[in-house]
UniProtKB/Swiss-Prot annotation:
Record family assignment: Belongs to the SecA family.
Reactions that this protein is recorded to catalyse: ATP + H2O + cellular proteinSide 1 = ADP + phosphate + cellular proteinSide 2
Membrane topology: Peripheral membrane protein
Naturally occurring in which organism (per UniProt): Streptococcus sanguinis (strain SK36)
Stated name of the protein: Protein translocase subunit SecA 2
Length: 793
């Protein structure tokens, strides 16, 4: 906190400079205020920096905010805006106006002409903020666009996207930006590209995007895989295993693997001798997928089974928010393994065409900043991973919410009934209540109990999230009772209804401590916004998931069989200090494990990041290279010919002829009887002649240098893309296959890096051969419009 105090003092000095321009800006006409934008651009061109301009530019935006929106940013909002410009994280409490705060750094950084972007977690917020705040930017002469559309079925064309991303300021969502990046890197030509270089970004709810979503990569799926029958076989096998005897489950690392006895059981079940030999890699992959499906993925925590239009389906849940992740599937066959576990129809397993994690996506920006209500507790991770400080911004009004001590019980039913008594007490007074649960299942249990007590309420979980923003916004009305899963309503302000403040404000009841402290803070933060009164309280039992998973072994002895009737009448609160310390220790252990898991994800993703950047850079170089495509092709052709002539041997003329028919030309003449198949020079000369004949024939047929260049470029890009798809898919399968090899005394990460490197080198060789094959062995045709139609081998 001492460090934060000094940071605040430093920010106040810059704030004073901003305020020194206040009266001057207030005296300007609208036209004069608007002219400041051009003046700032000219001063930048003359050598001033954005830091030099900040005090005056922020004063301009404050005045524009007041004139256009009727809102003048508070001093604390200006301090948050300074933090954002500096590329750090501003921790600002709920209701402190993060949306308005962002107008200042977005305007300032957009003055450079290199673009500024605000990324939020959902389409509704991106469109709302772009529409409302966009009035300010347009008033000041800047362009602003939203890169998302309300109708998710509507697809923007590359031309429309190019216009959007060329705007000075862009509002979008993390997923939309990620998919736009991946899709652009599958483009065949310049006309299909649309992104501007990534310059400056503000990430709203930065901890949710960069930490909580860090382990779910964005994936574009392509061609389907051949469906395997191993899923049901392995699912059956897993049900025969006993924990600790046949497999070990590590709570802390959230990993599971076979013991030596389990390996023998697998070899016996599958009638194999060596389970982990190279030829059994696909079996091992499916075995690991099934094991993970049964032990790592929990129904109603990580996914729900929902009745679809025709059949039941597995739909993923966002653990942090409790929301359904529609249209999202686990990759590498994990989704199908869960479907096999739940005995629903298996969906088609597809290959991953392109993939990136949010960590690596946002590292592409020159400068990252972010806003959140709960960043300070994970400051060390932001500093280690992104070199960003977290600065806690004071609230504009003092927080007067009462955070009451936790109530701790031995059993789950005791806790539930005690919390229900608390709900009835406050409901009788007329206080609005917001009850947060840790799972869909618990939210529905509380809903049933409230119905039994005759208490009308709204239930908000993954099964009925359509009216989320509306339900949360109305939950501050007198007598309102809302039951919700952990983080519902993030980004939505709860305003108190008439008379509620006199009753003590909104009461937030947490029915369990969550697996990280940030979610608990966010739950508390639903109440007591902008100086409003409020109350928050958590009810905990020793049987909660947090303590079951992360508590000490001696705690398990206290679990007992119980009669619901008995505990309902006499819930006994645990008051001993040792129990209270347990919760904090369990939460720290959980957070430490999650941090380690994110670090491992980043280390695995780093390997793909390097390979992806090399591949995408090569693609873009070819798309941009108008004249140099011939040189590139000559270089690749020479390498492939050299390899075929000098590094391969042919026993007979028939062998050489078969090679030519498979890789160079369908039209080649038979090899002369006197041809020396043992002379690499002769073979190289022959292959060079055949290649030149094929290329000249295609060029003559097209009768256009432009069409021929287009054909060459598409041939090369197709080879790159097909082989990169194979490599992405291979890396995903490799990670799964190696994840279960803990018994082997080898570091899975080191093994992964070595195998991935070898795979990448092999991919590059395959790619060169495919380029030559595409160029020489494709069939061409011209349609009536004069466009070339290509049929690749």
């Amino acid at each position: 906190m001492i460090k934060n105090h000094f940071q605040i003092q430093r920010l106040k000095k810059i704030l004073a400079k901003v305020k020194s321009f206040e009266s001057e800006m207030a005296g300007l006409t609208d036209a004069e205020l608007r002219k400041k934008t051009q003046e700032f651009k000219e001063r930048l061109a003359a050598g001033e920096t954005l830091d030099d301009l900040l005090p005056e530019a922020y004063a301009v935006v404050r005045e524009a905010d007041k004139r256009v929106l009727g809102m003048f940013p508070y001093d604390v909002q200006v301090m948050g805006a300074i933090v954002l410009h500096e590329g750090n994280v501003a921790e600002m409490a709920t209701g402190e106006g993060k949306t308005l705060t962002a107008t200042m750094p977005l305007y300032l950084n957009a003055l450079s002409g290199q673009g500024a972007m605000l990324v939020t977690t959902n389409t509704y917020l991106a469109l709302r903020d772009a529409q409302e705040m966009g009035q300010v930017y347009r008033f000041l002469g800047l362009t602003i666009e939203a890169a998302v559309v309300a109708d998710e079925t509507e697809n923007l064309t590359p031309k429309q996207k190019r216009l959007i991303y060329q705007a000075d300021i862009v509002y979008t969502t993390n997923s939309a930006l990620g998919f736009d990046y991946l899709i652009e890197n599958l483009a065949e030509n310049k006309d299909s590209q649309y992104l501007s270089p990534f310059n400056y970004v503000i990430i709203d709810e930065i901890d949710s995007i960069l930490l909580d979503s860090a382990q779910v990569p964005l994936v574009i799926s392509g061609a389907p895989r051949v469906q395997s029958n191993f899923y049901s076989i392995m699912d059956t096998f897993i049900t025969t295993l006993k924990e600790e005897e046949d497999y070990h489950y590590d709570d802390e690392k959230n990993e599971v693997w076979l013991t030596s006895k389990g390996i023998l059981a697998a070899e016996s079940f599958l009638d194999l001798e060596h389970l982990f030999s190279k030829e059994n890699q696909e079996l091992v992959r499916h075995l690991n997928l099934a094991l993970r499906a049964h032990k790592l993925y929990k129904k109603d925590k990580d996914y729900v089974v929902r009745q679809g239009d025709k059949e039941a389906e597995v739909v993923l849940l966002d653990r942090a928010t409790g929301r359904l992740l529609e249209m999202t599937r686990l990759q590498g066959g994990q989704h199908q393994a869960i479907e096999a576990k739940e005995h629903v129809k298996l969906t088609e397993e597809t290959r991953a065409m392109a993939s990136i994690t949010y960590q690596n996506l946002f590292r592409l920006f020159r400068k990252i900043s972010g806003m959140t209500g709960t960043g300070k507790v994970v400051e060390s991770e932001f500093m280690e991973t992104y070199s960003m400080s977290v600065i806690k911004i004071p609230t504009n009004q003092p927080v007067i919410r009462q955070d009451l001590p936790d109530q701790l019980y031995q059993t789950l039913p005791e806790k539930v009934f005690a919390s229900l008594d608390e709900v009835k007490h406050y409901h009788a007074q007329g206080n609005p209540l917001l009850i947060f649960t840790g799972s869909v299942e618990m939210s529905e249990i509380y809903s049933s109990l409230l119905l039994r007590e005759g208490i009308a309420h709204n239930l908000l979980n993954a099964n009925n999230a359509a009216r989320e923003a509306q339900i949360i916004a109305e939950s501050g009305q007198k007598g309102a009772v809302t039951v919700a899963t952990s983080m519902a309503g993030r980004g939505t302000d709860i305003k108190l209804g008439p008379g509620v403040a006199d009753l003590g404000g909104l009461v937030v009841i947490g029915t369990e401590r969550m697996e990280n402290q940030r979610i608990d803070l966010q739950i508390r933060g639903r109440s007591g916004r902008q100086g409003d009164p409020g109350i928050s309280k958590f009810f905990i039992s020793l049987e909660d998931d947090l303590l079951r998973k992360w508590g000490p072994d001696w705690l398990k002895k206290l679990y007992k069989d119980y009669s619901t009737e008995e505990v309902q009448q006499h819930p006994v609160q645990l008051g001993q200090r040792r129990f209270r310390r347990l919760v904090a220790k369990a939460q720290r252990a959980s957070e430490s494990s999650a941090k380690m898991s994110r670090r491992m994800t980043l280390e695995y993703a780093q390997c793909m990041k390097i390979q992806r950047e090399i591949t995408y850079a090569e693609r873009n170089r070819l798309i941009q290279a108008e004249e140099r495509i011939d040189e590139e092709i000559s270089r690749v052709l020479s390498q492939v010919i050299h390899q075929a002539a000098y590094e391969q041997s042919y026993e007979t003329r028939a062998d050489l002829y078969r090679f030519i028919l498979d890789h160079f030309s369908y039209h080649a003449e038979r090899i002369p009887y006197d041809f020396d198949i043992y002379s690499p020079e002769k073979i190289a000369e022959l292959l060079q002649d055949i290649a030149e004949q094929e290329l000249q024939a295609k060029k003559a047929y097209l009768k256009s240098d432009k069409l021929f260049t287009h054909f060459q470029r598409v041939s090369v890009l197709k080879a790159i893309d097909e082989n990169w798809v194979e490599q992405v898919d291979y890396l995903q399968q490799l990670k799964t296959a190696l994840s279960g090899q803990h018994f082997s005394m080898k570091n899975p990460l080191v093994e992964y890096y070595q195998e991935a490197y070898d795979g990448f080198e092999y991919m590059k060789e395959r790619m060169k051969q495919q380029i030559v094959k595409n160029l020489l062995m494709s069939e061409l045709a011209l349609n009536p419009k004069g466009e070339v139609i290509m049929y690749f081998p």
